């Protein structure tokens, strides 16, 4: 149930909010796509924690680049 809710929230962000904001993620795939895939693969707790760590790494001073869900 929590997994479903988090996936719906991420999808809502991707469809309704993200198109209206300038691109700022320095990683490929984007942080929202990473979060969606991590939660889908690992569940709400582990995937959610992986997403939080990824978002914390996404800042202008990081190197960025290709960083897929393991």
UniProtKB/Swiss-Prot annotation:
It is found in: Cell membrane. InterPro entries: Membr_insert_effic_factor_YidD. Keywords: Cell membrane, Membrane. It comes from the Bacteria. GO terms for cellular component: plasma membrane. It is a peripheral membrane protein. Could be involved in insertion of integral membrane proteins into the membrane. HAMAP family: UPF0161_YidD. Belongs to the UPF0161 family. This is Putative membrane protein insertion efficiency factor.
């Amino acid at each position: 149930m929590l997994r479903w809710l988090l996936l719906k929230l991420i999808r809502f962000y991707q469809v309704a909010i993200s198109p209206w904001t300038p691109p700022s993620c320095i990683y490929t795939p984007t942080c929202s796509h990473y979060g969606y895939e991590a939660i889908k693969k690992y569940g709400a707790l582990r995937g959610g924690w992986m997403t939080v760590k990824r978002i914390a790494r996404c800042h202008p001073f990081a190197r960025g680049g290709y960083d897929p869900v393991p």
